[in-house]
Swiss-Prot record:
Protein name per the record: Homeobox protein rough
Biological function: Required to establish the unique cell identity of photoreceptors R2 and R5 and consequently for ommatidial assembly in the developing eye imaginal disk. Repression of expression in R8 photoreceptor by senseless (sens) is an essential mechanism of R8 cell fate determination.
Entry keywords, A to Z: Developmental protein, DNA-binding, Homeobox, Nucleus, Sensory transduction, Vision
Bias type Low complexity, positions: 18-37, 314-325
Signal peptide: none
A GO CC term assigned to this protein in UniProt: nucleus
Biological processes, Gene Ontology terms: establishment of ommatidial planar polarity; positive regulation of transcription by RNA polymerase II; R2/R5 cell fate commitment; visual perception
Residues covered by region (Disordered): 1-51, 64-96, 300-340
Any Pfam family: Homeodomain
């Protein structure tokens, strides 16, 4: 039977040829036939190996196992033996290395707020568990200064919770009324008067002193709120008046043609409308202005006549009537424009 070296390709070729060869008889040398009997050596038949076994024998020495021993990394190698049964009955069990790379786990600091009790053993196990870096909380850092400050805060909170809280003083209606009367007499109570009130109302001097302090603060808050309200009302009134004054100035600066156009539009029928001042002829605009001025003068004179009617002489009344008639002759009537 031939022996092979798996590390050299030449022996591999010889191994392939020998595995595919048929069993033959090996003749003895001629010198041996004369003196010794003939011994026939038959080669043991071999089945062809599987490709897996073949390449493992050829390149198995090149495979190296790498173990990464970094801090925090866990390399779990599971070795499974997979025996391969060939047709010839020879069992081979190559060692196959399977590396399972896991996510590196970083220990997370746990904080014990209170002393652990036996009932919370499960919670303690959860607190000591490790978390991946993606789930880390930046607020809880491992800085000793932050931990010391947090511990001091918890200690102050425990002391504050353990301290008995002072109860709020509740005054009766009679006590409140008596104190209000005294406050309206004088906002700052003297020591002798405070002692008398404490004896009368069955309160301590400290309670009466604090009540007067709170009452003065309340008066200041009310006074400030009233001042703010007056200021807001003043600002609103000024803004309203400025708005009104702005509208009045705009109305007085508007041309007199707008009033004439409005009068003409009010007098129009269904088939007539008032033209804009830009489209009206200059003569019509001038006539409208003169009519406006004359109308204002007539109204003013009429009011003056009513006021001084008992002082005016009959001759003067006739003269005024004649002047009004002459003015009415020169004032043309408003002209209407037909759009059809």
């Amino acid at each position: 039977m031939l022996q092979q070296n798996p590390s050299s390709p030449l022996h591999a070729e010889q191994f392939i040829k020998s595995s595919n060869s048929t069993p033959t008889a090996t003749p003895a040398p001629a010198s041996a036939t004369a003196t010794a009997p003939i011994h026939t050596v038959l080669a043991t038949p071999q089945r062809p190996s599987s490709p897996r076994q073949f390449f493992e024998r050829l390149y198995g020495h090149l495979e190296t196992r790498t173990h990464n021993s970094e801090s925090g990394d866990i390399d779990v190698g599971t070795h499974a033996e997979t025996p391969y049964q060939s047709d010839g009955g020879s069992a081979s069990s190559p060692d196959i290395s399977i590396s399972d790379e896991r996510v590196s786990l970083v220990s997370f600091p746990s904080y014990e707020l209170h002393a652990p009790t036996p009932d919370y053993s499960a919670y303690g196990a959860i607190a000591n568990a490790t978390l991946p870096p993606a789930l880390s909380f930046p607020a809880f850092s491992a800085d000793p200064h932050i931990n010391a400050g947090f511990s001091a805060f918890l200690a102050r909170r425990r002391r504050k919770e353990g301290r008995q809280r002072r109860q709020r003083t509740t005054f009766s209606t009679e006590q409140t009324l008596r104190l209000e009367v005294e406050f309206h007499r004088n906002e700052y109570i003297s020591r002798s008067r405070r002692f008398e009130l404490a004896e009368t109302l069955r309160l301590s001097e400290t309670q009466i002193k604090i009540w007067f302090q709170n009452r003065r603060a309340k008066d200041k808050r009310i006074e400030k709120a009233q001042i703010d309200q007056h200021y807001r009302n003043f600002v609103v009134a000024n803004g309203f008046m400025s708005t009104i004054m702005g509208q009045t100035s705009y109305a007085t600066s508007a041309p007199a043609t707008s009033s004439a156009a409005a009068t003409a539009a009010a007098m129009l029928g269904s088939s007539y409308y008032a033209a804009t001042p830009a489209l009206l002829p200059s003569t019509l605009v001038n006539n409208a202005r003169r009519a406006d001025v004359n109308y204002v003068d007539i109204e003013a004179q009429h009011q003056q006549q009513q006021q001084h009617h008992h002082q005016v002489h009959p001759d003067q009344q006739q003269q005024q009537q004649q002047q009004q008639q002459r003015r009415s002759r020169f004032v043309p009537p408003p002209t209407l424009i037909n759009s059809c």
